[in-house]
């Protein structure tokens, strides 16, 4: 399936130069003063593990790999693998931790994830778009900070650092996007 360079997202698997590449960082859309707009994409080769930066014109179309997607439940870690269970057939599979890379801290026990297969081999794991996590460290609340739109650093219970509004305190639960690790809102 062909997709526009502007539609490329983190986690997409592309067929490029006769190999499978996973987009490992949020693509940067750039509109320079001279010349046409382009998209800067960081990709990782799924066979060799090498990383590469490519620049595509906004008008380019790329081949997105046709993947089979199944829902699995994360059970536990076993060495360097994740043990997942198919929620329909209850079959268990082991998938290397490296597939998740920097998103691994967002994985929680019993979380439902989407596993993408290419020729019956697991290639990618999609986490839910947002997760609820507790703040474990942050600066104290500053009086009168609710009116300003400034942010302060916070460390979550999974070790991830995010910027949060000034009014949030340690122990509060927040919603965080899993694709770019940014604060969304206070959990309800």
From Swiss-Prot:
Gene that encodes the chain: efp
UniProt-listed GO biological process terms: peptide biosynthetic process
HAMAP family: EF_P (MF_00141)
Domain of life according to the entry: Bacteria
Protein name: Elongation factor P
One cellular-component annotation, GO: cytoplasm
Organism in which the protein naturally occurs: Rickettsia canadensis (strain McKiel)
Main location: cytoplasm
Transmembrane segments: none
Lineage: Bacteria, Pseudomonadati, Pseudomonadota, Alphaproteobacteria, Rickettsiales
Function: Involved in peptide bond synthesis. Stimulates efficient translation and peptide-bond synthesis on native or reconstituted 70S ribosomes in vitro. Probably functions indirectly by altering the affinity of the ribosome for aminoacyl-tRNA, thus increasing their reactivity as acceptors for peptidyl transferase.
InterPro entries per the UniProt record, alphabetical: Elong-fact-P_C (IPR015365), NA-bd_OB-fold (IPR012340), Rib_uL2_dom2 (IPR014722), Transl_elong_fac_P/YeiP (IPR020599), Transl_elong_KOW-like (IPR013185), Transl_elong_P/YeiP_cen (IPR001059), Transl_elong_P/YeiP_CS (IPR013852), Transl_elongation_fac_P (IPR011768)
Keyword flag Glycosyltransferase: no
Pathway assigned to this chain's UniProt record: Protein biosynthesis; polypeptide chain elongation
Pfam families registered for this protein in UniProt: EFP (PF01132), EFP_N (PF08207), Elong-fact-P_C (PF09285)
């Amino acid at each position: 399936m062909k997709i526009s360079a502007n539609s490329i997202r983190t986690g997409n698997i592309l067929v490029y130069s006769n190999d499978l590449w996973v987009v490992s960082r949020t693509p940067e859309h750039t509109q320079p003063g001279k010349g046409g707009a382009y998209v800067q994409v960081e990709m990782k080769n799924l066979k060799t593990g090498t990383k590469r930066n490519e620049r595509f014109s906004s008008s380019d179309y790329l081949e997105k790999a046709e993947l089979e997607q199944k829902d699995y439940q994360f059970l536990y870690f076993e060495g360097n693998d994740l043990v997942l269970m198919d929620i329909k057939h209850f079959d268990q599979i082991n998938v290397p931790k490296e597939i998740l890379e920097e998103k691994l801290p967002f994985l929680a026990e019993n979380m439902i994830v989407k596993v993408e297969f290419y020729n019956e081999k697991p290639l990618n794991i999609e986490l839910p778009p947002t997760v609820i996590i507790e703040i474990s460290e942050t600066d104290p609340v500053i009086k009168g900070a609710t009116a300003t739109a400034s942010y302060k650093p916070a460390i979550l219970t999974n070790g991830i650092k995010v910027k949060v509004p000034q009014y949030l305190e340690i122990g509060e639960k927040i919603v965080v996007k899993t694709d770019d690790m940014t604060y969304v809102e206070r959990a309800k």
